[in-house]
Amino acid sequence: KRNLILSPAFKEFEQNANPRTREKLRYAISILETVYPVPTKFVKKLVGTDFFELRVSVDNEIRVILFAVDNDNINLATNVILLNGFVKKSTKDYDKEITKAINILR
């Protein structure tokens, strides 16, 4: 089982989600926490960054959670830091959210 660390920004994102979205987020996070290897259906490495994204689809909207791990290979990681989350509206959202994630890690 992987150790989850939740940033204040992630906790706020989760608390502000409606109950159905929160339930789906928790399900996806439980997979990230317990399933080896991590299914690529849920998780992708963000090219050119140290971050991964966990995607959850709810009511035709995609929620993205940015996270970091303690190993270059996610399947060997023991610690996962959930940094921040957002509703994906366009690919432009990523730059702003990646900057936020970098600042949270500091």
Residue ranges and their predicted role:
Residues 83:
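Conserved catalytic cores of phosphodiester-cleaving nucleases, focusing on short active-site segments
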